[in-house]
Each structure stands twice: as structure tokens, then as C-alpha cells.
Amino acid sequence: MAGATEGEDTKVIESKINELNIDKPKLEDNNEAKGNGNGNESGGDDDDDKEDDDDNDEITEPSTSTSSGDKKKKKNKNKKKKKKKIVSIDSSYPEGIFPEGQWMEYPLEDINSYRTTSEEKRYLDRQQNNKWQDFRKGAEIHRRVRHKAQSSIRPGMTMIEIANLIEDSVRNYSGNDHTLKAGIGFPTGLSLNHVAAHYTPNTGDKLILKKDDIMKVDIGVHVNGRICDSAFTMTFNEDGKYDTIMQAVKEATYTGIKESGIDVRLNDIGAAIQEVMESYEMEENGKTYPIKCIKNLNGHNIDDFVIHSGKSVPIIANGDMTKMEEGETFAIETFGSTGNGYVLPEGECSHYAMNKGVEHLKPPSERSKQLLETIKQNFGTLPWCRRYLERTGEEKYLFALNQLVRHGIVEEYPPIVDKRGSYTAQFEHTILLHPHKKEVVTKGDDY
């Protein structure tokens, strides 16, 4: 999830939940298009894995004759195999040990050699195993969900259909109805073309994915508040129009990952990213467009139940001498654009999150107080969107929601856009800074 200008065990996680006064949650069930924001949009629950995609084929049994001489044909009976329902990935990993991400050495050789040989550091890292397993479980869910998305999303689908496909898959793989235990880490980003981030459809949105669109797919998965944040860009144009910007952004992201590490200054990471990104140009209709870093979008560190936790990882040289530290978690993401390289808020808002440390703020009305309790019970400080509120049964909530925003209790995150007619792309991974090495926990075969 775009950012703009830990060794805890289960008891600590539960205490964080209790601090929010959380009871059992209620049943869980822009571009230019706008929705009404108050309807109920339910997603299908029959998602299946890619390997099950052929299970819908109709099987026709052959007709047989009923007597010698007469050839009476029986009506063919078409039988459909039932789709295989996605089940929690816990069934695949009964011991609770999930696949590790990609391990990488730290860039600073003197620090790296010390940490690799330090038994004490490695011992301390093992003591945080529950934390790492939460991240690895979330990452494995993320890989399976995006595999489903990449094999299923096609032009002609509505944004609602795409969002439901992804989000229902996250819910099913997580296998937990308590949204604060495991599930969606933040609203699914499906930003098109000049829209760089923070677009997800509201109920009633009729926007349809077109063949010439370039779509950023930003998916968040959390387990016990440990959030995996990873994004990729999809295109369907067959003439290779977007190949250059895709390559620029992907390479810039991998450069940021390579340069990240304990004691590395944030400015140095941004400078390395910028050098790679801005070495590319994109051609369209005989014109050449330089690929620019979107300078007011950043990567960010992640804390439990908090997607943007204070430190920002720039994608340009910005003079920030703050260092990354051992044990921190970062989302390394880069955005490239053929436009101004600067984004502004525009369009109907869908993304929201309750701010931290707002316990002393009093909701201005009884309705906003009741809505705030729904938010606490179901999301805590995790980001959410209007559709998620509606799954809890909330209706006619917009006035109360806007009250919470005006009083600083809830933060709104509207879509952010570059100039119209430009194209933007994004790639992102979550990295864990272990004492001896870094782990690109969300890395997969796809990106």
C-alpha cells in the first residue's frame, strides 16, 4: 500500500487487541466512476485454485438404446463437477511452519560479516520465530491469491468483480472469520492508468477493466497484525506498449530491496532507486516520454496492525539520513510515471483507517460513536474500505463516517493521481531485517 509525504508473542498481540476494547466482531460476511457508498455488495465464495479451473467442464454421459429394434434416445444428462472450495492454507502446513522468503545478504560488508557469524544474534532471531511465521504465512497466502488473480483477471471484468475475486480468496485462505486475527491487511488497490494508488471500488462502481489499461494490483494480507504488503502491475495490451515502464519500475524496486539493510540510510536507497528508474524512456505514437519516479510516494516501515509506521523509504534522493534498524519490517515499493512524477488526491474516497492514539477523542454523535465501535471491533487500526463496512451490516453511515474524519479519529486516503493521459506502474515487496540477513518474505516465482 502506497506511503505518502517486533519480536512479540501471541500474548502481546492479544493485549494490543484488548487495548482497542475489541469484542467479538460482527459477522464478516477513481478513476472517474463513482458508487453510492451505501449499498451491500457481496462477493462469491466459490473461488478455486488455478489447477481447478477445468473442474467446471460439463461431462455428458453417452445415450443408450432401450430395446432391440427401437433406438430411443435418452436425454443427455449434463453433470457439472463441483468447484473445489479454497480452504485455509493451514491444512497444507499442519505443523505451522511456512515457506521462507528469499534470503539476501546485507549490502554493508563489514556489518554483514559480523552478523552472519554472530551466534548470539542468530539465537535472538530464533526467539522471534512466531513473528516470522506469521509473516511467512501471510506471504504464502499472498502468493496463492495473486496467482489466482493473475490467471483469472481479464478485460471486461468490473472492478467490483476483480476486488471480490481477490478479497474472497484472501478470506478463504486465511480461514479465520475474526478479521483482527488474520485476513485482509488493507483494501485491494486496483488503480488504473494515471491513478497511481488508493483506488478500490465502492459499491455501485461500474468501472470496467479495458484491454489498454495498465492496472496496479496492491494486495495486503495480515496474520495476527503482521502485514504483508506486495504489489504488481498488470497489462493486457499485446503490442508491448507498457514493457519499458514495467521493466523500469520492477528493476527500481529490486534495486531498493538490494540496497536496503541494517544501518543503511534511507536517502541512499532513494538515490539508487532514482538512478535506475530515470534511466528509462517510454515511446508512444512516435513520442518519447522519460520515466519519472513519483517523488511524493514512498515505501514505508510496517508495525503490528499499522501499515505506515513512521519511517518512509524515498524513491528519490531526499537527504533523509535516518537509518534502517535491526528487526524492522519494510515495504519497498516504487512508482514510475510518464507524467509529472507527482500525485495529488482526486476522486471519491474508498480507503480509511482509524488513527492511533485517539482514545481521548470523543465521537461527535451517537451514530458516529456506534460506527467507531464497529470499526474498532472489525479493523482496529488496519485500513479498510466502505465495502468492508457494509459486510458488517452497516448502512447509511456516510454522514457519521465523515464526522469521524473531521474530528481526526479516522483518516481518509482518497485516490492519488498524476496528470490525465499519463501512465503509472508499481511493484512492491515486504522485507524483514533479521540480525544476520534480510528476507524478501513476499518474493514468488512471478516477481
Swiss-Prot record:
Residues bound to a divalent metal cation 2: 229, 300, 333, 428
Domain of life: Eukaryota
Coiled-coil regions, chain positions: none
Cofactor note: Binds 2 divalent metal cations per subunit. Has a high-affinity and a low affinity metal-binding site. The true nature of the physiological cofactor is under debate. The enzyme is active with cobalt, zinc, manganese or divalent iron ions. Most likely, methionine aminopeptidases function as mononuclear Fe(2+)-metalloproteases under physiological conditions, and the catalytically relevant metal-binding site has been assigned to the histidine-containing high-affinity site.
Cofactor entry: Co(2+); Zn(2+); Mn(2+); Fe(2+)
Enzyme class per UniProt: hydrolase
InterPro entries named in the record: Creatinase/aminopeptidase-like (IPR036005), Met_Aminopeptidase_Type2 (IPR050247), Pept_M24 (IPR000994), Pept_M24_MAP (IPR001714), Pept_M24A_MAP2 (IPR002468), Pept_M24A_MAP2_BS (IPR018349), WH-like_DNA-bd_sf (IPR036388), WH_DNA-bd_sf (IPR036390)
Compositionally biased residues, Basic residues: 71-86
Single GO term (MF): metalloaminopeptidase activity
Key words, A-Z: Aminopeptidase, Cytoplasm, Hydrolase, Metal-binding, Protease
Record keyword Translocase present: no
Reactions mediated catalytically: Release of N-terminal amino acids, preferentially methionine, from peptides and arylamides
Record field: transmembrane: none
Chain spans, region Disordered: 1-86
Acidic residues bias: start-end ranges: 43-60
UniProt name for this protein: Methionine aminopeptidase 2
